[in-house]
Amino acid sequence: MGNALRFLYGHCCKPTVEDHYQPPHGYGVSTATVGVSALAHDLFHFENTSQIPEGLTKYVVSSKKAQTNWYKKLSQAWREAKPPPQTAEQATRLIILTLKRHQKADVKGLLRFYGLPLSNNPSTEATTVVAPPQADQGVKFELHTLPVDVKAVADGDTVTVYVNTEDPREASNLPKSVKVAAQERAKARAVRDYVKADALQKNIVDAGYRVLSGPNNEDILARKYRIRLRGIDSPESSMPFGKEAKEELIKLVVGKCLTVHIYEEDRYGRSVGDIYCNGQFIQEKMLKKGLAWHYTAYDKRPQLSKWEEKARAARVGLWASSNPEKPWEWRKNKRNGK
C-alpha cells in the first residue's frame, strides 16, 4: 500500500457514499471532496482484497474483469501521484489520464459513480452538507481496518477489527518487541519450526496483535481492536431478535474494510466508535432495521432517535412487539439473578 494513498485515505475518508454517490447524512463532508474520499477508500480496499466496489457495474459497460484492470491501473497511478489527488478536479484528471485508452462510456460512468465532475472545469455546483454541531466532536482517532472476519462479530453492536501496522498511526505505536516477534515468527515458519512460530504468535496475540494472511498469502502484522458501536444497544444474543441483529451486522461488515471513528474506551476495554462501510453509517442501518435501540443514556444525537422512531412507526424488527424488553434492563435483571 503506497504512503500517498494511505495518507489521503486516512486524512479525508469520512462516511462516503452508498451505491455510490449520495450525500452522507450531514456528517460534515462536502460534495466537492466526498468522491475523492470514496475513491481513496475503494483503492485502499482493492489493494487489500482485490475486490472492486459493489454497484459499479450499473454505471459502466465493460466486464468485471475489465473493471479489475482499471483499479490496478488507478492504484498504481495514485501511488505515483505526487501529491495524490485531494480535490474532485484532481481525481477526475487522474482517472481520465489513467484510463484514456478505455471506452469513453466507462470513464464517464466511473466518474458518475464517484460523483466526480465529467470535465476538468467542475465543482461550481458543489455544495456543502451542513453537519450537526455534535457530529464529530470528541473523535480521538480514526481506524481503517483490514477486511472483517465472520467470527469477529460478537453480536449486533460489537465487532473485533484488525488494523495493518503499516498504517502510519499504528506504525508509530508498534512495540519493538512485537515487531521483532513477528520477524522471528516469519523466519521460524520459513524453516518449518512451527512450534517456535506458534509460541511467537501467542506472544504477539497476548500483546494485542496478530499475524494474518493477506490476499496473496503474505503475512500482515495487525493490531486488534474490539469495537462497541457508539450510541446503539442491540438485543443480547439470547434475547428475541438477538440472532437477527448479529446476522444483520455480519451482512453489513464481513469481508469489508471499515472506517471507524473512535471516541473513548469503555469499562470493558472496548473502543467505542462510529462505523462506516461502503458509504453506509452502520448504526443508522441497525436502527432503521429495528435491530437496535438508541442508547440515550450514553448518546444524545437526535438523528439516532429519529431513525429509531422511524423503525418503531413501521413496526419492523424488534418493534413488531408492542413492548420489547430493553437490553440494558435485561442485563440488569441477569446481574440481580432475576
From Swiss-Prot:
Name of protein: Uncharacterized 38.1 kDa protein
Gene3D superfamilies: 2.40.50.90
SMART domains associated with the record: SNc
Pfam family name, one: SNase
Active site positions, chain numbering: R228, E236, R270
UniProt keyword Nuclease present: yes
UniProt superkingdom: Eukaryota
TM annotation in the entry: none
PROSITE patterns according to UniProt: TNASE_2 (PS01284), TNASE_3 (PS50830)
This protein's UniProt keywords: Endonuclease, Hydrolase, Nuclease
GO CC, alphabetical: cytoplasm
GO molecular function: endonuclease activity; nucleic acid binding
TNase-like domain: residues covered: 144-321
Keyword Nuclease: yes
PANTHER family, sorted: EBNA2 BINDING PROTEIN P100, SERINE_THREONINE-PROTEIN KINASE 31
